[in-house]
Amino acid sequence: MLLLLLGIIVLHVAVLVLLFVSTIVSQWMVGNGHATDLWQNCSTSLMGSVQHCFSSSANEWLQSVQATMILSIIFSVLSLFLFFCQLFTLTKGGRFYITGVFQILAGLCVMSAASIYTVRHPEWHFNSDGSYGFAYILAWVAFPLALLSGVIYVILRKRE
């Protein structure tokens, strides 16, 4: 049981790291000397040093991506906190429903953010020769992992 709990905690922390990195790092869209994330657009020189950074568009679609990514982090942190609280207060045989629901909500929020970005990014990125960066891919990787950990929490029963 201890090994199972450790595995679940490691999975949850991995999801949190993926969510934080994908939200913070400036690599959602890259190409031809520029890198774009949810917060700013940066141009780089041939040597790789950052030349100019300016705030991202105030487009409402981009703001919805920002909001849902932040919500996914909040839900996942809250889920981890609730898991530790329930670990010590839940009666024997009880299930971690609340923890699982918040983790599933985190997964759905990150899926919504990545989907909105995929569909609507041409509206605020006019450069069509770019490609998706690693932070965008990390967001998509965090989605199934968050759902998986949420389902594991819902199925998991507390033992002594």
UniProtKB/Swiss-Prot annotation:
<keyword id="KW-0832">Ubl conjugation</keyword>
<feature type="topological domain" description="Cytoplasmic">
    <location>
        <begin position="157"/>
        <end position="160"/>
    </location>
</feature>
<feature type="topological domain" description="Cytoplasmic">
    <location>
        <position position="1"/>
    </location>
</feature>
<feature type="topological domain" description="Extracellular">
    <location>
        <begin position="32"/>
        <end position="64"/>
    </location>
</feature>
<feature type="topological domain" description="Extracellular">
    <location>
        <begin position="120"/>
        <end position="133"/>
    </location>
</feature>
<dbReference type="GO" id="GO:0051726">
    <property type="term" value="P:regulation of cell cycle"/>
</dbReference>
<keyword id="KW-0338">Growth arrest</keyword>
<dbReference type="GO" id="GO:0005886">
    <property type="term" value="C:plasma membrane"/>
</dbReference>
<keyword id="KW-0472">Membrane</keyword>
<dbReference type="GO" id="GO:0032288">
    <property type="term" value="P:myelin assembly"/>
</dbReference>
<dbReference type="InterPro" id="IPR004032">
    <property type="entry name" value="PMP22_EMP_MP20"/>
</dbReference>
<comment type="function">
    <text>Might be involved in growth regulation, and in myelinization in the peripheral nervous system.</text>
</comment>
<keyword id="KW-0131">Cell cycle</keyword>
<dbReference type="InterPro" id="IPR050579">
    <property type="entry name" value="PMP-22/EMP/MP20-like"/>
</dbReference>
<keyword id="KW-0325">Glycoprotein</keyword>
<feature type="topological domain" description="Cytoplasmic">
    <location>
        <begin position="92"/>
        <end position="95"/>
    </location>
</feature>
<protein>
    <recommendedName>
        <fullName>Peripheral myelin protein 22</fullName>
    </recommendedName>
</protein>
<dbReference type="Pfam" id="PF00822">
    <property type="entry name" value="PMP22_Claudin"/>
</dbReference>
<keyword id="KW-1003">Cell membrane</keyword>
<feature type="transmembrane region" description="Helical">
    <location>
        <begin position="96"/>
        <end position="119"/>
    </location>
</feature>
<keyword id="KW-0812">Transmembrane</keyword>
<comment type="similarity">
    <text>Belongs to the PMP-22/EMP/MP20 family.</text>
</comment>
<feature type="transmembrane region" description="Helical">
    <location>
        <begin position="134"/>
        <end position="156"/>
    </location>
</feature>
<feature type="transmembrane region" description="Helical">
    <location>
        <begin position="65"/>
        <end position="91"/>
    </location>
</feature>
<dbReference type="InterPro" id="IPR003936">
    <property type="entry name" value="PMP22"/>
</dbReference>
<keyword id="KW-1133">Transmembrane helix</keyword>
<dbReference type="InterPro" id="IPR004031">
    <property type="entry name" value="PMP22/EMP/MP20/Claudin"/>
</dbReference>
<feature type="glycosylation site" description="N-linked (GlcNAc...) (complex) asparagine">
    <location>
        <position position="41"/>
    </location>
</feature>
<feature type="transmembrane region" description="Helical">
    <location>
        <begin position="2"/>
        <end position="31"/>
    </location>
</feature>
